[in-house]
């Protein structure tokens, strides 16, 4: 890896496509949903997760083993990409991988809010961003949310969280804090992003991700029951929505889907839009948005094969694989029917 000099997209994309071909598909998922946690762990041991399952097998078992192995493998895969990348390409990928810093911050905050144990929170952390082990340990050691805000002062999340904490204390829900984390992440992604040929499609993808994040946030707020205005939590940088229209769209999913279908995204989304129209719950709608974003990234990657978007597309696809396997393991441990679990997966 080098942060200076020229980029090397051809080399990195070739490596990433080889990794993409090793991701689980329909056949593997059909097998997994009919296995118990111990069988799932053994299945993973014969796949790309072999090293992690073997390394962790003496300390963990069942769903705990699966989750720790998934998160360690995810971090390794993305750190490998950074090791391969040079120059501007490295910078673009590193910025995007800060999404896992954002994920970890929100996971710790949610854990404190819900009263989860340190072990439960740690099992959900993904060490693929810029936070080092010392900072993550300090976050895990925090006994209350205000302490997390203090620990993060000096990071890209510090100022936004400090400003949002007072509102959180007033409303008693996590929306202000989580939105502050998301805003900080997307602001640093777009900050000083020079739209040359290498970054043009990358910016188009980021705009789509922000648009879908705004849609997701508005729906969550509308269904939270809290006295919150979606306009106050609008994230700048997208192209599809105006802040003032989100409140009305959030109460009418059909209009929201129509807005997406009639936009530039409609031409590049097919199955995902049908899933959005068929979604009958917030969870179902969010799952369909995940699938739509993945399909959009895939399409950009095919149209512009030497841009950064095939790499971002792989990052999303790998995340979905980890989410799917985790959902299967937790569902099987809870005794859910295989068909019910399969319906919850995001597969393209």
From Swiss-Prot:
UniProt keyword Transport present: yes
Known role: Component of the A-type ATP synthase that produces ATP from ADP in the presence of a proton gradient across the membrane.
Keywords: ATP synthesis, Cell membrane, Hydrogen ion transport, Ion transport, Membrane, Transport
Residues of the signal peptide: none
Main location, first listed in the record: membrane
Protein name per Swiss-Prot or TrEMBL: A-type ATP synthase subunit C
UniProt subcellular location: Cell membrane
Gene Ontology molecular function, alphabetical: ATP binding; proton-transporting ATP synthase activity, rotational mechanism; proton-transporting ATPase activity, rotational mechanism
Protein topology in the membrane: Peripheral membrane protein
Lineage: superkingdom: Archaea
InterPro entries: ATPase_csu/dsu_sf, ATPase_V0-cplx_csu, ATPase_V0-cplx_csu/dsu, V-ATPase_V0D/AC39_subunit, V-type_ATPase_csu/dsu, V-type_ATPase_csu/dsu_dom_3
